């Protein structure tokens, strides 16, 4: 019997090991297939003007005449001061900034920068969709360093004289100030991006870039959207999926980021496995790598210490570090809430959560949506209202990835508290919305006015109706003004409402 048991266990273990190996091989095959597809798309792009950037470190910035320094960080360029605009809302955020780690060095011609389309001097006063595709290779370079590579590549724009950069990935938005336009060329921008990364990160051995300025004769926004769908999204989803294998319970350290304090002086972003940062640039894995590489930089460790509230995600260590790094402005952060002590808001968020008092529910809105919300304001107006480093109870910036989290606004009732969102955003997140509430969340196609939203929620029997008096009249929370504390009794009411939806 013992011999049979041992043989059975050995067979089961071998079978499991075989399954793991098969899964790994299938994942590797899929990754290689995607890499080949990306190379084919790279090669299929129209020919452009080729510039060979210096590859000798002594000459990395030869020819570049614009300043690159921290004092340039956080510039905002108003419409009247704009020389040109790339991406952004005029093109429904159909532009991209794509960073790729290439495994085969022979695919890259080091220092090659190809500008497909017009140069900067040819597009004064214009607004065009665009795509920056940057590739890096190094023997020790893996996708674990992707967030680090992305951040350092962005510095050519974020710290580049005259540039305004907002958002990331496929929602990127650039403007160039007319005062500094004479200093700039796209070829030198590509040179700055790849060589800044080489200086900061010696593992990078080779790099090249393609800059697509998508005029109509080059396919316009349709061309950049095709590249987003075929290149950016599959690559980023695979990387994000790996990041989601961790949960907050798996780690004893979160990470903080203060890079946005150049324009939001009291803002502190807390990066956790289940709570990606608003900007969408980094993950918990990326923050860990960046902190290990530069322990004295703007990314820092946050030891969790005692868990004050497991359901809401409040930790003594997070509160202490946020208080210290926010110039002692804020004392509490509840990680899984947008209503009670949410994280502060900078201005880089890809989407936002907002409280709708007329129905005692939450709404979502993303940058791509240009219409009004039930608050009777657009995303841009809402963003202007809640940004700047304030703690706005009931209003919180998020990244596109945040609603995919298992702990998305869990303390507020999770998805069962969400009552409205744009149709396109809802479709994007469909697989992450619980089936019992999906059809009960209104979009602009159903209603926008708060009174009409109230009737819609009653008609579909949305879970939030359980919070209303007799299921008929909402009892809105008395939310405190920004940067102030909750009344202790009202905070209890807010927390109990979240728990009630949890039990439901």
Annotate the PLM regions.
Residues 2-5:
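Low-complexity, intrinsically disordered or signal/transmembrane-proximal segments
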């Amino acid at each position: 019997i013992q011999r049979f048991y041992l043989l059975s266990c050995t067979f089961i273990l071998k079978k499991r090991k075989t399954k793991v190996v098969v899964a790994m091989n299938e994942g590797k095959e899929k990754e290689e297939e995607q890499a080949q597809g990306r190379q084919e798309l790279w090669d299929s792009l129209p020919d452009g003007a080729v510039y060979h950037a210096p590859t000798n470190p002594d000459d990395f910035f030869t020819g570049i005449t614009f300043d690159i320094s921290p004092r340039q960080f956080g510039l905002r360029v108003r419409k009247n001061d704009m020389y040109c605009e790339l991406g952004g809302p005029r093109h429904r955020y159909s532009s991209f900034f794509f960073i790729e780690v290439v495994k085969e060095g022979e695919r890259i011609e080091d220092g090659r920068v190809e500008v497909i389309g017009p140069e900067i001097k040819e597009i004064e006063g214009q607004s065009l969709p665009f795509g920056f595709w940057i590739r890096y290779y190094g023997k020790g370079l893996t996708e674990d360093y992707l967030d680090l590579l992305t951040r350092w590549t962005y510095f050519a724009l974020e710290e580049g004289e005259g540039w305004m950069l907002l958002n990331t990935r496929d929602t990127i938005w650039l403007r160039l100030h007319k005062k500094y336009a004479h200093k700039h060329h796209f070829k030198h921008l590509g040179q700055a991006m790849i060589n800044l990364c080489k200086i900061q990160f010696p593992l990078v051995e080779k790099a090249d870039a393609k800059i697509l300025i998508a005029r109509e004769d080059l396919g316009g926004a349709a061309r950049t959207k095709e590249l987003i769908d075929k290149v950016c999204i599959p690559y980023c989803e695979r990387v994000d999926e790996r990041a989601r294998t961790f949960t907050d319970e798996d780690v004893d350290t979160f990470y903080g980021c203060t890079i946005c304090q150049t324009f939001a002086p009291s803002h502190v972003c807390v990066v956790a496995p289940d709570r990606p940062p608003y900007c969408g640039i980094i993950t918990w894995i990326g923050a860990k790598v960046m902190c290990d590489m530069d322990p004295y930089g703007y990314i820092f460790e946050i030891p969790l210490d005692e868990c004050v509230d497991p359901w809401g995600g409040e930790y003594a260590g997070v509160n202490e570090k946020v208080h210290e790094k926010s110039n002692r402005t804020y004392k509490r952060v509840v990680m899984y809430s947008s209503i009670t002590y949410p994280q502060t808001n900078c201005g880089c968020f890809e989407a936002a959560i907002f409280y709708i008092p007329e129905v005692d529910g939450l709404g979502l809105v993303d940058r791509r949506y240009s219409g009004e919300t039930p608050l009777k304001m657009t995303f841009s107006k809402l963003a202007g209202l809640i940004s700047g480093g304030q703690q706005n109870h009931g209003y919180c910036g998020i990244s596109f990835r945040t609603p995919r989290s298992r702990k998305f606004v869990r303390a507020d009732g999770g998805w069962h508290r969400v009552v409205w969102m744009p149709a396109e955003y809802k479709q994007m997140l469909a697989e992450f919305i619980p089936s019992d509430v999906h059809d009960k969340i209104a979009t602009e196609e159903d209603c926008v006015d708060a009174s009409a939203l109230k009737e819609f929620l009653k008609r579909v029997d949305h879970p939030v109706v359980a919070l209303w008096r007799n299921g008929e009249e909402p009892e809105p929370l008395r939310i405190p003004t920004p940067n102030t504390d909750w009344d202790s009794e009202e905070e209890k009411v807010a927390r109990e409402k979240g728990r009630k939806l949890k039990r439901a």
